[in-house]
């Protein structure tokens, strides 16, 4: 059950990432420095809750995907 919930969350995040890639607005998109809750995508430094995708440094609760360093705070 926990795996199913995590998988569902991952699918939702992928859908959001796809929507952002297609040019629809989303919170905290772009490379460089992003801070705050919501959705973050791009290289550089990310801090805050929500979903983080990309290389660099990630900090905050939620889901982290990408190279380098990531942990849940």
From Swiss-Prot:
<keyword id="KW-0677">Repeat</keyword>
<feature type="modified residue" description="Arginine amide">
    <location>
        <position position="72"/>
    </location>
</feature>
<keyword id="KW-0929">Antimicrobial</keyword>
<feature type="repeat" description="4">
    <location>
        <begin position="50"/>
        <end position="55"/>
    </location>
</feature>
<feature type="repeat" description="5">
    <location>
        <begin position="56"/>
        <end position="61"/>
    </location>
</feature>
<comment type="function">
    <text>Has antibacterial activity against the Gram-positive bacterium B.megaterium LM101.</text>
</comment>
<keyword id="KW-0027">Amidation</keyword>
<feature type="repeat" description="2">
    <location>
        <begin position="38"/>
        <end position="43"/>
    </location>
</feature>
<feature type="repeat" description="3">
    <location>
        <begin position="44"/>
        <end position="49"/>
    </location>
</feature>
<feature type="repeat" description="6">
    <location>
        <begin position="62"/>
        <end position="67"/>
    </location>
</feature>
<feature type="signal peptide">
    <location>
        <begin position="1"/>
        <end position="19"/>
    </location>
</feature>
<dbReference type="GO" id="GO:0050830">
    <property type="term" value="P:defense response to Gram-positive bacterium"/>
</dbReference>
<keyword id="KW-0732">Signal</keyword>
<feature type="repeat" description="1">
    <location>
        <begin position="32"/>
        <end position="37"/>
    </location>
</feature>
<protein>
    <recommendedName>
        <fullName>Armadillidin</fullName>
    </recommendedName>
</protein>
<keyword id="KW-0044">Antibiotic</keyword>
């Amino acid at each position: 059950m926990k795996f199913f919930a995590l998988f569902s969350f991952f699918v939702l995040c992928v859908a959001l990432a796809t929507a952002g890639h297609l040019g629809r607005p989303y919170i905290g998109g772009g490379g460089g420095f992003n801070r705050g809750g919501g959705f973050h995508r791009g290289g550089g430094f990310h801090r805050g809750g929500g979903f983080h995708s990309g290389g660099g440094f990630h900090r905050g609760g939620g889901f982290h995907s990408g190279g380098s360093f990531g942990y849940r705070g």
